[in-house]
Amino acid sequence: MKPVFAALAMGLGLAAGSIAHAAQPWDGTYVYEQALGPGAGGTQNFVTHTLTVSGPEGCRVVAQGFQTDETIRCKAMPDGNRLLVTFVSFDNGKVENKYGVKLYSPGQPLFVISQAPNGLVTTWQGYSKAAGDGASSAAFKKVGR
């Protein structure tokens, strides 16, 4: 009888764990390829912005490319058909970047991603690497879970 109870308990524990860690609709990886225009010699310069979301506290924005290498810890808050992304800190846990410059305040909105009929729309709010505040574009694309 003990093996049956042990197997049942393990099965229930795994099921409960699966429920507790079920993926949220916004969880996943999003990428925005920002074209900066041609550089010296006519070569096109880009910055790749990768947003990774795994629950509200599991949020990172990594920007890499032309003269850019930055990781931001963020908070991702679902609000219906929108995902609000706010600043927590830089990857080192500080509010100043690796050059000692404070670009954002904790809790400051960076951008909002919204579900639209034709895909995702990004509205920029404070993210310094993007277009001006309030501008909207089809920037981030979901590329994986």
Where do the protein language model's features map onto the residues?
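Positively charged n-region of N-terminal signal peptides that target proteins for export
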Residues: M1-V4
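Contiguous, well-ordered beta-strand patches that form the walls/edges
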Residues: V62-P117
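Edge beta-strand at a domain terminus
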Residues: T68-L84, A116-R145
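Sec/Tat signal peptide C-region and signal peptidase I cleavage site
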Residues: G17-A22
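Generic short beta-strand segments
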Residues: V31-G37, P56-G58, T86-K94, Q125-Y127
